[in-house]
UniProtKB/Swiss-Prot annotation:
The keyword Ribosomal protein applies. Transmembrane segments: none annotated. Located on the platform of the 30S subunit, it bridges several disparate RNA helices of the 16S rRNA. Forms part of the Shine-Dalgarno cleft in the 70S ribosome. GO terms for molecular function: rRNA binding; structural constituent of ribosome. GO terms for cellular component: ribonucleoprotein complex; ribosome. It comes from Rippkaea orientalis (strain PCC 8801 / RF-1) (Cyanothece sp. (strain PCC 8801)). PROSITE patterns: RIBOSOMAL_S11. This is Small ribosomal subunit protein uS11. The gene is rpsK. One of its GO terms (biological process) is translation.
């Protein structure tokens, strides 16, 4: 019988980053929370889809809260204490994601809205008729 091969992959080492930047990208269909250190290297991330939501439920505020909570817990395990929050997009999960980051135990020092606003750029999609 053949012997099982040993794993030779690199194990992810625990960083010790006390402060960082949280990017919340909230669209109508999903919310993505990425927490990086001050250099820009990603420490943890989570999305509504990776938190177990599918379809239209990914765009809900509760899904954004769950995603932000998961990302914050992983960042706290890496030693993060303080974050600056950059919010982008028009989605429903913007405020709830910020509250979830705060509720998870991270101290928020700054909240900035970095949503790109066109100077009359592309034509927007047509109105929905339901």
């Amino acid at each position: 019988m053949a012997r099982p091969t040993k794993k030779t992959g690199t194990k992810k080492q625990k960083k010790n980053v006390p402060n960082g930047i949280a990017h919340i990208q909230s669209t109508f269909n999903n919310t993505i929370v990425t927490i990086a250190d001050t250099k820009g290297d990603v420490v943890s991330w989570a999305s509504a889809g990776s938190s177990g939501f599918k379809g239209a439920k990914k765009g809900t505020p509760f899904a954004a809260q769950t995603a932000a909570d998961a990302a914050a817990r992983r960042a706290i395990d890496q030693g993060m204490r303080q974050i600056e929050v950059m919010v982008s997009g028009p989605g429903a999960g913007r405020e709830t994601a910020i509250r979830a980051l705060q509720g998870a135990g991270l101290e928020i020092t700054l909240i900035r809205d970095v949503t790109p606003i066109p100077h009359n750029g592309c034509r927007p999609p047509k109105r929905r008729r339901v």
